[in-house]
Amino acid sequence: MDDKQYKGTTTVGIICNNGLVLATERRATMGNLIASRDAQKIYQLTDNIAMTIAGSVGDGQRLARMLQAESKLFELRRHGPMSINALSMLLSNLLWEYRIFYIQVLVGGVDKSGPKLFSLDPAGGRITEVKFSSTGSGSPLAYGVLEDRYKQDMSVEQGVELAAKALESAMKRDSASGNGMQFCVITPGKVEIFEREVGKQVCNS
C-alpha cells in the first residue's frame, strides 16, 4: 500500500440488544506522519445503515459515495429501502470486482429482524458477525477488551462504553490510532453520530 495515502486505523462494531454501536478513533496517518487528527471514518449510508473504514481514507470516501448512490437508486426503483444483507452483498461485490480499495469495512444497521453487523476484507470476503468485530492496525488490542468484557444483551449505552474502552486500549499502544473517538448508534428508526474525547464517559452503565 502506498504510504502517501491517508490511512484510517482502529474501528469497532458491537451488536446490542436494542441496536448497533459503531466506533472509530480519529487519527489518519501517511507513513510516519500524523496527517489528520479528525479523520472521518464513519459514514451513514441509509436511514438505518452505516459503515466504518480502516485503511485508505480516500478509498473509503469513494466507496461510501457509491453505496449511498446505489441505495438511493434501489429505493426509487423498488419503492422501498435496501436491506442490510443486500447492501452488504453489494459492497462485497464492489470490493471483489474492483479490487483497488485498500480498506477493511464494518457495515451494519437495524431492521425488522434486529441489529446486523458484517465485516468485509479488501477482496470482498464477507463475514456475518454475531457479537462484535474490529478492524485496523489496533484491532488486536481492541479485541482483547471486547473478548473480555462483551456480554449478551448489552444495551447500546453499555455498548458505547465498551467500544470506548476497546478504542482506548488500541490508542495506548498503536501509534496509528488516536485523537478522540466518533460513535454511531443505530436503533429502530434512528441513527445518531457523535464524538467524544478520550477519557470522558458518555453515560453511566
From Swiss-Prot:
Top EC class for this record: hydrolase
InterPro entries cross-referenced by the UniProt entry: Ntn_hydrolases_N, Pept_T1A_Psome_bsu_arc, Pept_T1A_subB, Proteasome_bsu_CS, Proteasome_sua/b, Proteasome_suB-type
Protein encoded by which gene: psmB
Family: Belongs to the peptidase T1B family.
Stored Gene3D superfamilies: Glutamine Phosphoribosylpyrophosphate, subunit 1, domain 1
Reactions catalysed, as given in the entry: Cleavage of peptide bonds with very broad specificity
Active site: T9 (nucleophile)
Entry keyword NAD: no
Name of the protein described by the UniProt record: Proteasome subunit beta
Keywords: Autocatalytic cleavage, Cytoplasm, Hydrolase, Protease, Proteasome, Threonine protease, Zymogen
Prosequence residues removed at maturation: 1-8
GO cellular component: cytoplasm; proteasome core complex, beta-subunit complex
Subunit structure: The 20S proteasome core is composed of 14 alpha and 14 beta subunits that assemble into four stacked heptameric rings, resulting in a barrel-shaped structure. The two inner rings, each composed of seven catalytic beta subunits, are sandwiched by two outer rings, each composed of seven alpha subunits. The catalytic chamber with the active sites is on the inside of the barrel. Has a gated structure, the ends of the cylinder being occluded by the N-termini of the alpha-subunits. Is capped at one or both ends by the proteasome regulatory ATPase, PAN.
Gene Ontology MF terms in the entry: threonine-type endopeptidase activity
Job description of the protein: Component of the proteasome core, a large protease complex with broad specificity involved in protein degradation.
GO biological process terms, semicolon-separated: proteasomal protein catabolic process
Pfam families: Proteasome
Cell compartment(s), UniProt: Cytoplasm
Free-text activity regulation comment from the record: The formation of the proteasomal ATPase PAN-20S proteasome complex, via the docking of the C-termini of PAN into the intersubunit pockets in the alpha-rings, triggers opening of the gate for substrate entry. Interconversion between the open-gate and close-gate conformations leads to a dynamic regulation of the 20S proteasome proteolysis activity.
Keyword presence, Aminoacyl-tRNA synthetase: no
Main location: cytoplasm
Lineage: Archaea, Methanobacteriati, Methanobacteriota, Stenosarchaea group, Methanomicrobia
E.C. no: 3.4.25.1
